[in-house]
């Protein structure tokens, strides 16, 4: 048998194998697998014309729980020895209060079993998202993992559009929403899930290009941007560039209070115009003066119904992820009976108030709204707010504003929620453990 070492290819292969770090490769593989499980999902290209789709999905939930639970365990085991110090910083009184409140909320939920089951999945997904900034060994590995997952996702989405449009594009055969016919959804179950993911991939493409990835960076940017347009997702499309501009301003603003004003004043204003238009005639009249649909494509009926539910249990809430499954007998005002068939309240903040109560909502705001900006201020004060920090800030801001018309916060394996947690965790770790060099790791040693 010929010795491969005598051949140039054999020498190259031997060099590659000699330099291969098995642990780092396993960590990268786990990161990519996680991203694909979240974004492509375990059930890609669902057939929305199939009346049994919901039953089929429910019957396969065990696979989802096992998959995310296993990935979370593997991710922690692969990197725990190097990231233990970073993970210890998550054990704060605020985070422990949040966990404690969730336990309390689940115990007093209207459907404790449902809440517990769904929070178990959410906890696994959150663990994976928190590990994502730590799992790749270097920033270059981080870039390559996210780029690989984005390219695979985009390739699958476009192949679906070309080869199987009946399960990649909303059409008249869809049982639930045939009026969305023509809107692209790719591998996702709905355009409103596809569109925010594509907006986030636009930010990823910009980030990768800024780090010198002049081939796949622009490719991800262009193809995700084009797909975003064809999804017909109005909220994500409108926010994509507006949030990027807002993030750009925040990244050059010095003071923390000025940053807070720039980030949160428009956010409060939008919430007042949207949900506020339901309980305030003044905000309703102001909304009607704007060149937009004052019902926000029918969302006002859902908000009115959700506000009524919130008033029933403002402190305890109805139970994590347990309310919208049990409202088939609910009542709304005349002409808005369809609101009881909604899957969520179409506003992340209102949805949390309904399900986990005001204390839970306040804790979420402290952890996921206020703390990330404070962490960014720490990074900015050290003059270390590079492209990676800017990516996290942009995704975080996009999530805050997207949540004004869609419910995704604490939404189990929702890809927008997953990427939002990645951004929040990234800012948390960067504020405490700066990246060492252009391709260094998060220094947690």
Name each model feature, range by range.
Residues 1-104, 134-148, 211-212, 377, ...:
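Transmembrane signal-anchor hairpin modules in multi-pass inner-membrane enzymes, especially those
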Residues 57-77, 116-128, 193-202, 238-245, ...:
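Membrane-embedded alpha-helical segments of multi-pass membrane proteins
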Residues 72, 99-103, 143-175, 179, ...:
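Alpha-helical transmembrane segments of multi-pass inner-membrane proteins
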Residues 83, 134, 215-216, 248, ...:
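Hydrophobic transmembrane alpha-helices and their immediate junctions
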Residues 84, 159-166, 231, 251-294, ...:
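A membrane-periplasm/extracellular boundary helix in multi-pass inner-membrane enzymes
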Residues 91-99, 112-134, 144-150, 154:
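Aromatic-anchored transmembrane helix interface
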Residues 288-304, 312, 316-356, 375, ...:
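Long extracytoplasmic/lumenal interhelical loops at the membrane interface
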Residues 391-445:
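Transmembrane alpha-helices of multi-pass inner-membrane enzymes
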């Amino acid at each position: 048998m010929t010795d491969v070492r005598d051949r140039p290819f054999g020498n190259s292969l031997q060099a590659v194998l000699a330099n291969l770090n098995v642990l780092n490769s396993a960590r990268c593989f786990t990161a990519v697998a996680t991203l694909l499980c979240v974004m492509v999902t375990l059930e890609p290209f669902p057939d929305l014309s199939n009346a049994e789709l919901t039953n089929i999905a429910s019957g396969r939930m065990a696979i989802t729980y096992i998959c995310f639970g296993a990935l979370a365990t593997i991710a922690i085991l692969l990197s725990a020895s190097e990231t233990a110090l970073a993970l210890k910083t998550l054990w704060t009184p605020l985070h422990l209060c949040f966990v404690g409140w969730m336990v309390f909320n689940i115990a007093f939920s209207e459907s404790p079993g449902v809440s517990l089951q769904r929070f178990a999945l959410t906890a696994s997904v959150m663990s994976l998202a928190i590990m994502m900034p730590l799992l790749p060994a270097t920033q270059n590995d981080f870039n390559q993992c996210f780029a690989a997952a984005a390219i695979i996702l985009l390739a699958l989405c476009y192949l679906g559009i070309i080869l199987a449009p009946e399960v990649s594009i909303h059409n008249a055969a869809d049982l639930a929403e045939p009026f969305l016919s023509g809107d692209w959804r790719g591998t996702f179950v709905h355009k409103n899930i596809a569109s925010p993911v594509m907006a986030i991939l636009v930010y990823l493409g910009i980030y990768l290009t800024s780090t010198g990835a002049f081939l796949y960076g622009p490719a991800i940017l262009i193809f995700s941007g084009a797909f975003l347009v064809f999804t017909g997702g109005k909220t994500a499309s409108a926010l994509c560039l507006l949030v990027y501009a807002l993030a750009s301003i925040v990244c050059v603003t010095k003071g923390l209070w000025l940053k807070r004003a720039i980030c949160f004043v428009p956010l409060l204003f939008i919430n007042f115009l949207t949900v506020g238009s339901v309980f305030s005639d003044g905000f309703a009249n102001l909304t009607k003066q704007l060149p937009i649909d004052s019902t926000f494509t029918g969302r006002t009926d859902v908000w009115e119904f959700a506000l009524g539910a919130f008033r029933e249990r403002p402190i305890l809430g109805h139970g994590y992820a347990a309310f919208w499954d049990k409202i088939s007998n609910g009542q709304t005002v005349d002409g808005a009976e369809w609101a009881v068939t909604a899957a969520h309240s179409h506003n992340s903040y209102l949805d949390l108030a309904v399900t986990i109560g005001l204390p839970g909502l306040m804790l979420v705001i402290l952890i996921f709204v206020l703390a990330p900006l404070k962490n960014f201020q720490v990074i900015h004060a050290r003059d270390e707010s590079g492209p990676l920090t800017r990516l996290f800030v942009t995704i975080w801001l996009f999530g805050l504003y997207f949540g004004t018309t869609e419910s995704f916060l604490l939404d189990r394996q929702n890809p927008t929620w997953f990427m939002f947690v990645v951004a929040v965790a990234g800012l948390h770790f960067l504020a405490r453990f700066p990246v060492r060099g252009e391709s260094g790791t998060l220094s947690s040693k």
